[in-house]
C-alpha cells in the first residue's frame, strides 16, 4: 500500500487500511475476514437465499421468450447456459479476489470499488495508473445501473396497473398511474436494511412461483409443432439476445450487498452454497420460460410474455397483479444498492450522526422521485433494457472481475504456461466484444423505435 493512503471508507463501517501485517510464519493465512465482520442486522442463509432469487428473477425473465426469438431455441438454450455459467464464474472470481484482498489487508471487508482500487495497485505496472479512478468509476457504474433498473421497474408497475384499470374502470395515461404508485414506492424504499426486506423477498418469491405456474399453463395449452420454430437465427440478432439475457441474469450489486450482509458468508460461495444453488434455479427457470415461451409464441413473443397471454381472462390478470407486487418489492432491493453506495460512502459523513436517519429518508425519497421523473420523461424506457445489459453489465459482471483477478494474481503468478492469464484474457475479450456489439445493436434498435 502507498503511504499516502491512510483510510478507506467501507460501507457500512470504516476500516483502517495499513500495510498488511503478517503472522509469525510470514503469511496472512491465519486471518479469516469472515470471522471479523461485525454487522448490525445480519441475514440468515434462508433470508439471503430469498434475496438472491428475488434479485436474480426480475422483469428480465419475462423477456426471455422474446430473447429466444433473437437466437432460436437451440442457440437460445445453449447461449443462455453459457452466458449464465460465465456470469456465475465471474461472480465467483470477484468474491474470491475480494476475500484475498481482505486477507492481505487484514480487514473484514472491502467493497467492489475498493477491491478494484487495491487490485490495480498490486497488478501489472501499466494498469496501476487506473487505481485512482477505480473507486468513483465502479461506484458510479453500480449506482447508475441499479438506478436504471428502478426506472424500468416504475414503468413496468405502472403499465401492469394500467392494463387492469383500463379493463375494468377508466382509461388513463400511463403517467397518471406512475403518479399513483409514488407513495407505495416511497414506503417500500424507506426500509433501509436487508433483514427487514427479507420477508418481502420471501413473499415475492411465492407470488413469482404462482405467476410462473399460470404463465406455463397458458404456454402448454395447445403448443404448436416445434418444427414451426427456428433452432437458429441470423447472427446479427444475437447481440440483442446477449444484452437481454445478461440484463436478466446479472444483479452484481445486489448479490455483493447480500453477501456482505450475511451472518455466515462462507455459506455463500461453497460448492453447494447459495450462489451456485440459486444460479442453478435461476438458469433453469430462464431456459424453461425462454424455450417454451418461444415454442408457443414464436416471433410474436412480446417484450414481456404477460402481453402474449389472454388479456381479458382472470388468471392472466392475476399474473399481472402478482408481477406488479413482486416488482414493487424488487424496486427496494435493486434501489438498495444505489442508496447504499451514494449515502453510506459519500453523503452520510456530511451530516451529524443524530440527523442521519432523517436525511437518509429524504435522500431515498429524492431517488424515488428521480426514477419517477425519468420514467415519466421516457415511458418507453423498456427499450433501453438491452442497452443497459450490454453496456453496464458487460463491464460490471464480466470485464471488471476478470481484470481484478489478473491484478490479484500478478504477484503470485498465473500458473504453468500462464494458463490463468490466458483464460482471463479470453474472458476479457468476450466481455469487451459482447459489450461493444450489444451496445451498438441496442442503440440502433432505440433509434428505430424513435424514428
UniProtKB/Swiss-Prot annotation:
Keyword Transport: yes
Pfam families: Aa_trans (PF01490)
Keyword field contains Transport: yes
InterPro entries per record: AA_transpt_TM
Alphabetized GO MF terms: amino acid transmembrane transporter activity; L-amino acid transmembrane transporter activity
GO BP term (any one): regulation of growth
Transmembrane segments: 49-69, 81-101, 137-157, 168-188, 200-220, 238-258, 273-293, 321-341, 358-378, 383-403, 421-441
Entry superkingdom: Eukaryota
Subcellular localization, as worded in the UniProt entry: Cell membrane; Late endosome membrane; Lysosome membrane; Basal cell membrane
Keywords, alphabetical: Amino-acid transport, Cell membrane, Endosome, Glycoprotein, Growth regulation, Lysosome, Membrane, Transmembrane, Transmembrane helix, Transport
Glycosites: 75, 299
Disulfide bond residue pairs: none
Tissue: Expressed in the proximal and distal regions of the midgut; expressed in enterocytes and progenitor cells. Expression increases in response to intestinal bacterial infection and spreads further into the midgut, eventually covering the entire midgut.
Record's bilayer topology term: Multi-pass membrane protein
Induction remarks: In the midgut by intestinal bacterial infection; probably in response to the cytoplasmic purge response to infection by enterocytes.
Cytoplasmic face of the membrane: 1-48, 102-136, 189-199, 259-272, 342-357, 404-420
Effect of inactivating the gene: Viable. Adult flies show delayed recovery of the midgut epithelial wall following the cytoplasmic purge response to intestinal bacterial infection. RNAi-mediated ubiquitous knockdown or tissue specific knockdown in enterocytes or epithelial progenitor cells impairs recovery of intestinal wall thickness after the cytoplasmic purge response to intestinal bacterial infection. RNAi-mediated tissue specific knockdown in Malpighian tubules, visceral muscles, enteroendocrine cells or the fat body has no effect on recovery from intestinal bacterial infection.
Residue spans, topological domain Extracellular: 70-80, 158-167, 221-237, 294-320, 379-382, 442-451
Function: Amino acid transporter which has pH-dependent electrogenic transport activity for alanine, glycine and proline. Plays a role in positive regulation of growth by directly or indirectly modulating the effects of the TOR signaling pathway. Required in enterocytes for the efficient recovery of gut epithelium following the cytoplasmic purge response to bacterial infection. Acts cell-autonomously to promote the retrograde transport of amino acids into the intestinal epithelium.
Misc note: 'Arcus' Is the Roman goddess, homologous to the Greek Iris, who personifies the rainbow and replenishes rain clouds.
Family: Belongs to the amino acid/polyamine transporter 2 family.
Protein name, UniProt field: Proton-coupled amino acid transporter-like protein acs
Native organism: Drosophila melanogaster (Fruit fly)
Amino acid at each position: 500500500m502507498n503511504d499516502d493512503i491512510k483510510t478507506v471508507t467501507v460501507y457500512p463501517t470504516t476500516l483502517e487500511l495499513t500495510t498488511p501485517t503478517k503472522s509469525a510464519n510470514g503469511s496472512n493465512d491465519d486471518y479469516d475476514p469472515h470471522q471479523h465482520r461485525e454487522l448490525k442486522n445480519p441475514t440468515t442463509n434462508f433470508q439471503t437465499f430469498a434475496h438472491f432469487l428475488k434479485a436474480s428473477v426480475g422483469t428480465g425473465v419475462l423477456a426471455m421468450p422474446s430473447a429466444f426469438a433473437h437466437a432460436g431455441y437451440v442457440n437460445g438454450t445453449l447461449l443462455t447456459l453459457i452466458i449464465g455459467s460465465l456470469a456465475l464464474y465471474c461472480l465467483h472470481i470477484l468474491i474470491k479476489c475480494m476475500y484475498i484482498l481482505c486477507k492481505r489487508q487484514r480487514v473484514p471487508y472491502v467493497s467492489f470499488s475498493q477491491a478494484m482500487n487495491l487490485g490495480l495497485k498490486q497488478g501489472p505496472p501499466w494498469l496501476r495508473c487506473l487505481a485512482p479512478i477505480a473507486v468513483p468509476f465502479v461506484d458510479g457504474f453500480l449506482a447508475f445501473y441499479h438506478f436504471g433498473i428502478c426506472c424500468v421497474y416504475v414503468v413496468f408497475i405502472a403499465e401492469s396497473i394500467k392494463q387492469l384499470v383500463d379493463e375494468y374502470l377508466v382509461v388513463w395515461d400511463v403517467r397518471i398511474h406512475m403518479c399513483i404508485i409514488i407513495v407505495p414506492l416511497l414506503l417500500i424504499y424507506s426500509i433501509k436494511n436487508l433483514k427487514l426486506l427479507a420477508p418481502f423477498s420471501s413473499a415475492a418469491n411465492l407470488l413469482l412461483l404462482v405467476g410462473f405456474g399460470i404463465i406455463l399453463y397458458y404456454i402448454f395449452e395447445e403448443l404448436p409443432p416445434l418444427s414451426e420454430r427456428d433452432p437458429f437465427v441470423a447472427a446479427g440478432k444475437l447481440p440483442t439476445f446477449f444484452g437481454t439475457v445478461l440484463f436478466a441474469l446479472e444483479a452484481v450489486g445486489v448479490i455483493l450487498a447480500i453477501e456482505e450482509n450475511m451472518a455466515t458468508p462462507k455459506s455463500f460461495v461453497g460448492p453447494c452454497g447459495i450462489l451456485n444453488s440459486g444460479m442453478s434455479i435461476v438458469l433453469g427457470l430462464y431456459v424453461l420460460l425462454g424455450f417454451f415461451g418461444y415454442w408457443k409464441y414464436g416471433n410474436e413473443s412480446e417484450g414481456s410474455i404477460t402481453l402474449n397471454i389472454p388479456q381479458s381472462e382472470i388468471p392472466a390478470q392475476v399474473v399481472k397483479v402478482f408481477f406488479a407486487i413482486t416488482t414493487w418489492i424488487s424496486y427496494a432491493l435493486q434501489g438498495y444498492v444505489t442508496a447504499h453506495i451514494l449515502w453510506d460512502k459519500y453523503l452520510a459523513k456530511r451530516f451529524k450522526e443524530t440527523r442521519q436517519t432523517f436525511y437518509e429518508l429524504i435522500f431515498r425519497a429524492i431517488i424515488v422521485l428521480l426514477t419517477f421523473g425519468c420514467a415519466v420523461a421516457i415511458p418507453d424506457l423498456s427499450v433501453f433494457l438491452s442497452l443497459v445489459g450490454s453496456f453496464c453489465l458487460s463491464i460490471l459482471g464480466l470485464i471488471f472481475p476478470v481484470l481484478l483477478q489478473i491484478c490479484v494474481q500478478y504477484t503470485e503468478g498465473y500458473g504453468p504456461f500462464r494458463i490463468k492469464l490466458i483464460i482471463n484474457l479470453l474472458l476479457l475479450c468476450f466481455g469487451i466484444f459482447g459489450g461493444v456489439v450489444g451496445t451498438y445493436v441496442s442503440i440502433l434498435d432505440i433509434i428505430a423505435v424513435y424514428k
